[in-house]
Structures are given as C-alpha cells and as structure tokens.
Design a protein with these regions (language model features):
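Short, Lys/Arg-enriched N-terminal segments with co-localized hydrophobic residues
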Residues: 8-24
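N-terminal, charged low-complexity regulatory/assembly segments
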Residues: 26-106
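Amphipathic interaction/junction segments at domain boundaries or subunit interfaces
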Residues: 97-192
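Short, hydrophobic/π-rich interface segment
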Residues: 167-225
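Short, charged/polar, Gly/Pro-enriched secondary-structure boundary elements
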Residues: 186-188, 236-243
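Short, cationic low-complexity segments
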Residues: 208, 246-257
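C-terminal edge-of-domain segments
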Residues: 226-235
Length: 257
C-alpha cells in the first residue's frame, strides 16, 4: 500500500477532478445544425443540472448530463428545421427548444424524476418575467387592453414563422380576451416522440403566469389532446369564472369546465 502525504493527496484529487471536467461534453461540441436550431438556454441548462444533482451522486452526474445533451442533439437531428433559430422569439428561455431539452432530461431520468418536478422546471424558466409584471391588473380595462395588444403583436411573430399558428379574436369591451393556437411545435414534438404524458407539466405554466397578472386563464383543450390550445383570459375577479371552474384532468392538465 502506498501512502501519500495529505497535501500530495489533495493535489492528486484536484488533478483528477480537473481531468474529469475536461472530459465534460461541451455545449459547443454538440452535433446539430446550428443554422436552423438553437441550444437550450443557460437558465434551462442550470435547471436540468440542478435536478440531476438532486437525484444522482456526484460521481454519476456528468455522465447523466452528457446523456441528456446527446439525447437533445439526437432529437434535433430528426426535427423540423423551419422554426427560425435565434431569430424567433419563441426559441428563448422557456420556449420551444427549452421544452425539447426538458423532454430530453425526462427521457433520460424518467426513473427518478416526477411530474411536479418537470412542472416546476418550466415554471422556473417562465415565471420570473411575469413576477416582474405583478403591477399589471387584468381586472382593469386599461391593462386588459394593453394585454390584448401584446397578444396581437405576438400573432405577427407567429405569422412570420408559422410555428405557433395563432388566431386572436377581436377585442370587446368588458369581455374576456380570447386567442388560440391551432399548431404548437412543442406538442407536435411530444406527439412525434411519444412524450405526451409529460406535456401537461409544460403547459400548466400558462395558468400560473396569468395568475401573476391578477388574471385567470380558462382553457378547455390543447393541441396535445385536441385540435387547438385555447386561451380565454379575464381578470381574477370576473364573474365569468363562476361558470368555468378549474380542475385537473386524469392526464394532469389544468383545464376548465
């Protein structure tokens, strides 16, 4: 048995750890077409690695993370190439590609993760910007009108890329805002790869985001289990809500009567 002084032993451990770090799969080395696809966002990367650290010992974490990275690249190798890359606002934090990254994590770590954990990951990506907008009150006509204009602007972006096919109903004073998607790349991806079971965890954030604006989302169907994803949005004090109580269906979707 060879005995090393503690200082020499610490140096050896540090060098070994450094070698392990050098063996990490770098994001820049992932093989996918970056002319049409984008890498998952840094916040998404942080979320996934945090969950891996929660479930796996330190000696396994880099291996698991590399599996997630490779699965992401594999998915993109057989995925549509017309989503606009970095130019499309839907491909930012919490958007289409982050959803694909989370689904990559789910396929690799399905044995240890949970529905609520996936739901939480998407919330942590989407909700921070809505928390900064807590001063918005959808019960007030002015804010409701400004929200409507924001949805109309979003539709123009959708019309440019034809990723989320969006229709916005005309604005009516005193009535809820309504718009719908008849196409959703995230839902399309989940259907293609047999991952629809986890889509409710990614879709439910829409309800949580509206609640931060003193608003309520009323939804009856999604592109995952129907032909559209509907958004009826009103203030959280609107009498309209009494006729549309919220519930969770068997799949885990938050929806309304």
């Amino acid at each position: 048995m060879v005995c090393l002084p503690k200082s020499r032993l610490n140096d050896f451990v540090r060098k070994t750890e450094s070698k392990d770090e050098n063996k990490q799969m770098k994001d820049k080395n992932l093989l996918f077409d970056r002319n049409c696809h984008v890498l998952y966002s840094k916040p998404c990367r942080k979320e996934i690695r945090a969950k891996i650290a929660l479930h796996y010992p330190a000696t396994e974490r880099e291996t698991v993370w590399e599996k997630v990275q490779r699965r992401y690249a594999e998915f993109l190798s057989d995925w549509r190439t017309d989503l606009g890359g970095k130019k499309n606002f839907h491909n930012g934090v919490g958007g289409t590609y982050d959803c694909i990254a989370i689904m990559s994590y789910y396929t690799v770590c399905k044995a240890v993760t949970s529905f609520r954990e996936i739901e939480e990951m998407e919330e942590n990506l989407i909700l921070p910007i809505f928390r900064r907008l807590r001063f918005v009150d959808c019960n007030k006509p002015l804010w409701r009108k400004l929200m409507y204009r924001a949805f109309v602007r979003a539709k123009r972006g959708c019309d440019k890329w034809h990723d989320y096919e969006m229709t916005v109903a005309p604005y009516e004073n005193g009535k809820p805002i309504y718009y719908e998607f008849t196409a959703c790349p995230a839902a399309e991806f989940a259907i293609k790869y047999g991952l629809t079971d986890i889509m409710p965890a990614l879709c439910n954030v829409d309800f949580a985001s509206m609640e931060l604006l003193h608003a309520k989302l009323v939804r009856t169907t999604t592109c995952v289990d129907g032909c559209r994803c509907d958004y009826t949005i009103c203030g959280d004090k609107d009498p309209y809500l009494k006729g549309h109580p919220e519930y969770r269906d068997e799949a885990g979707f938050r929806r309304n009567r």
